[in-house]
Curated annotation (Swiss-Prot):
Protein name, entry field: Type III pantothenate kinase
Annotated positions binding K(+): 129
Family: Belongs to the type III pantothenate kinase family.
Localization per record: Cytoplasm
Listed PANTHER family: TYPE III PANTOTHENATE KINASE
Length: 266
């Protein structure tokens, strides 16, 4: 039984896989001022509520884009599970070829998603991860990670509008019935959601053109993941599939490729 941990800027997602299926997954806040004990209390309560014995965990892997929580998070995992966690980063075997100018700049979340897409789908793919930031990544059928782009996430865009425009309220991220709206809240939702859909469609169009017109001439499959993927996917035809478990699947694959690291550290 392995514990998979994906630490993002807003939430930490934890999943437990028993070798055949996920038996539990949870989401907790990734507030930067928590101690290892505070994280431990939260995580142990979740294990208890799901009737899972922490002693049955045989390995742990972590992907993080939040450096300031890693000290507390790693200490908690060592204390609670008595395993040295594998940290996704330099030195970890991925099975993909990162074509970035500086491969160390690529976020762990993007690497994990790329590994999952390559291993599961075995075809050229554009991965859109709707998180705190929205990332677009291009991966060839042979596992070459070509790069991509990074945009402010939908919630960041909505929060910026609320924070910088004095008379505009904070709004729920819901799709309005019409593009032309007759009240402030719906008008903001229209601009935020439909504007974001337009951004996604244009970026996907340009990325497809570059992948098709390059020497590779590949037609990519468009895969979406992240908390708001379903919201956007329902409103556009450029997304071929939503895979909500893509990041956890990538972590599971990376654990299998690197579990000898954890064994050697015992």
């Amino acid at each position: 039984m392995i514990l998979l941990v994906d630490a993002g800027n807003t939430n930490i997602v934890l999943g437990v896989h028993n070798g055949e299926r996920y038996i539990a997954s949870w989401r907790i806040s990734s507030e930067g001022n928590k101690t290892s004990d505070e994280y431990g209390i939260q995580v142990m309560q979740l294990f208890n509520l799901s009737d899972i014995d922490p002693k049955n965990i045989t390995g742990v892997i972590v992907s993080s884009v939040v450096p300031n929580i890693m000290h507390s998070l790693e200490n908690m995992l060592r204390k609670c599970f008595c395993h040295e966690p594998i940290i996704v980063g330099p030195g970890v075997k991925t099975g993909i070829n990162i074509k970035y100018d500086n491969p160390r700049e690529v976020g762990a979340d993007r690497i994990v998603n790329a590994v999952a897409a390559y291993e599961i789908y075995k075809r050229p793919v554009i991965i859109i991860d709707f998180g705190t930031a929205t990332t677009f990544c291009a991966v060839r059928a042979n596992g070459d990670y070509l790069g991509g782009c990074i945009c402010p996430g939908i919630r960041i865009s909505a929060d910026a509008l609320f924070e910088r425009a004095a008379k505009l309220p904070r709004v729920e991220l819901e799709v309005p019935k019409n593009m032309i709206c007759k009240n402030t809240v719906s008008s903001m939702q229209s601009g935020i959601i439909f504007g974001y859909i337009g951004q996604v469609e244009y970026i996907v169009k340009k990325m497809k053109q570059e992948m098709k017109n390059s020497k590779y001439k590949e037609e990519p499959f468009v895969l979406a993941t992240g908390g708001l993927a379903n919201l956007i996917a329902k409103e556009t035809d450029v997304i071929d599939k939503v895979d909500s478990d893509l990041t956890l699947e990538g972590l599971k694959i990376l654990y299998e490729k690197n579990k000898e690291i954890e064994i050697s550290q015992r």
